[in-house]
């Protein structure tokens, strides 16, 4: 029977791995002790901003510089295709500046939470002990916490997809409104997309704050088992 092959690192490689672990544990400690509480407070303050408390959603509407064609006169009904008047073309159509400004605030927050989830996942994975017989209750807790953090990360990734989808759907609506300029419903659809996006962005910030609060609760409540799953040593972040 072949002997198991152990993984051996050179002295320099071992130093680099150890340095990475130490930096990882330090980042995790800073995240839990400093970053998390401050982020919950800062998101609460962001939710109090006027930009996230718009009562009249119609005020969010961006002007659509799309000319509305005049109705054809009765004597034009029998004219040939060559004789028909051209539909006036629209020029440059910018995005909704109010929504773009709000996106500039929310998008970095989404990215930050995703990166922090990756940090926590990597940290806990480095704390999982050698698999062997014995008391694995602490390991089970580590796995449960990892499962929940991964779930949060998945939801945050869905936020990123939703932001991209907003631009795609709004772009389609604007394209239709500029092509079929006589159909007012397409213009209304553009405004509807903006109003829906505003509500979604506010909900995102609420969810981001809730996710941070959940991470703080689930990690702090189970910190002893996370950092010391076997209960053999004094619990430590390191």
From Swiss-Prot:
The modification N-acetylalanine is found at residue 2. It comes from Rattus norvegicus (Rat). Gene3D superfamilies: Proteasome activator pa28, C-terminal domain, Proteasome activator pa28, N-terminal domain. The modification Phosphoserine is found at residue 10. This is Proteasome activator complex subunit 2. The keyword Plastid does not apply. It comes from the Eukaryota. Keywords: Acetylation, Phosphoprotein, Proteasome. Induction: By interferon gamma. Belongs to the PA28 family. The keyword Zinc does not apply. Pfam families: PA28_C, PA28_N. GO terms for molecular function: endopeptidase activator activity; identical protein binding. Heterodimer of PSME1 and PSME2, which forms a hexameric ring. InterPro entries: PA28_C, PA28_C_sf, PA28_N_sf, Proteasome_activ_PA28, Proteasome_activ_PA28_N, Proteasome_activ_sf. GO terms for cellular component: cytoplasm; nucleoplasm; proteasome activator complex. One of its GO terms (biological process) is regulation of G1/S transition of mitotic cell cycle. Residues 65-86 are annotated as: Disordered.
């Amino acid at each position: 029977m072949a002997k198991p092959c152990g993984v051996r690192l050179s002295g320099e490689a071992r130093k680099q791995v150890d340095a990475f672990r130490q930096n990882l544990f330090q980042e995790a400690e800073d995240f839990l002790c400093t970053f998390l509480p401050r982020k919950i407070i800062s998101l609460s303050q962001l939710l109090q901003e006027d930009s996230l408390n718009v009562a009249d959603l119609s005020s969010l509407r961006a002007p659509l510089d799309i000319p509305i064609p005049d109705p054809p006169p009765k004597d034009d009904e029998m004219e040939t295709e060559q004789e028909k008047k051209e539909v006036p073309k629209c020029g440059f159509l910018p995005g909704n500046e109010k929504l773009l400004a709000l996106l500039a605030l929310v998008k970095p927050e989404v990215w930050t939470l995703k990166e922090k989830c990756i940090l926590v996942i990597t940290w806990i994975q480095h704390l999982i002990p050698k698999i062997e017989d014995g008391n694995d209750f602490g390991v089970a807790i580590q796995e449960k916490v990892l499962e929940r953090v991964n779930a949060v990360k998945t939801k945050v990734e869905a936020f990123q997809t939703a932001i991209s989808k907003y631009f795609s759907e709004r772009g389609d609506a604007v394209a239709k409104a500029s092509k079929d300029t006589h159909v007012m419903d397409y213009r209304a659809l553009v405004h509807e997309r903006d109003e829906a996006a505003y509500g979604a962005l506010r909900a995102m910030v609420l969810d981001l704050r809730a996710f941070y609060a959940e991470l703080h609760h689930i990690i702090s409540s189970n910190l002893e088992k996370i950092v010391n799953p076997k209960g053999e040593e004094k619990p430590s972040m390191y």
